[in-house]
Amino acid sequence: MSHEKSESCLQEKKHSSSFERFHDGTSLENNLLQNLKLSSQRVLEIAQKKGRSKCPKCNSSRMFYCYTCFVPVESVPSDEIPVVKLPLKIDIIKHPNETDGKSTAVHAKLLAHEDVTVYTYPCVPQYQDQKHEVVLVFPGPDSVSLSDSLLYIRGSGDMQNDSSCEPSLKRPKCSQQYDKSKNEGVEEKKPMHFLKKLIFIDSTWNQTNKIISDERLQGLQQVELMERKTCFWRHQKGTPNTYLSTIEAIYYFMIDYHTIILQKDYKGEYDDLLFFFSFMYRIINDAKKSAGKL
């Protein structure tokens, strides 16, 4: 996703108040990092003082984590890094020219490693047999809101279940059946159970066209996150501040899914997705203040 920043993000506070103000539409960028419920970042503070450290896999010198091996460096014990369990699987398709060290896709893999897979384009999975359970989170002329995508997901699921549901090598056999005749006049409380996987594109915006136009992604419903403003510190000129970094897009989608689809109160379950992001933001923001740039 794009590399964008907000000019007025405030510093994050550990273990602070709930995330209620995220949905009131006011001062969104001001509230993001100060309202997170994060695990202790003491391990990152210690690592910062030590400086760069070796990757345990490739021996490269890195700060905090290795962005090519997707593991913490030796100075950051892996058991002190939070693990976030996501309700959906995530595929991240990264542009080959995307600078690994500038990408936030690695944050998702580090913090939710069981639920996140990163592919480097042109390596793209086949999704044609999974259209009824996959959405592409990407803004565009055909993108819809998360709520509106319910109609597409349900419709595709109905058509899939009406046909012979034979197992294939690419997709496990159908485990859920949806009998529309039995549900006429009955409101579906959780119709998004069809949704199993999200696709995110990790790229600067001027490089996304090649990936988004790939035939393997055609026919997938696109979902756009509305009214969210980025706090990413790498501003890409000419794009609106609603164009989010990859980790921000994943984070916001999970909150929307949790509150809109699962209809549960959000209590910070996914805040640790911004564990590295918020800490790095604070470092960069402090450096800008010291240099008189803020």
UniProtKB/Swiss-Prot annotation:
InterPro entries: DTW, tRNA_Mod/Golgi_Maint. Its main location: nucleus. Residues 158-185 are annotated as: Disordered. One of its GO terms (molecular function) is tRNA-uridine aminocarboxypropyltransferase activity. Signal peptide: none annotated. GO terms for biological process: tRNA modification. Transmembrane segments: none annotated. One of its GO terms (cellular component) is nucleus. It is found in: Nucleus. It comes from the Eukaryota. A motif (DXTW) lies at residues 202-205. Its EC number is 2.5.1.25. Keywords: Nucleus, S-adenosyl-L-methionine, Transferase, tRNA processing. It catalyses: a uridine in tRNA + S-adenosyl-L-methionine = a 3-[(3S)-3-amino-3-carboxypropyl]uridine in tRNA + S-methyl-5'-thioadenosine + H(+). Catalyzes the formation of 3-(3-amino-3-carboxypropyl)uridine (acp3U) at position 20 in the D-loop of several cytoplasmic tRNAs (acp3U(20)). This is tRNA-uridine aminocarboxypropyltransferase 1. It comes from Xenopus tropicalis. The gene is dtwd1.
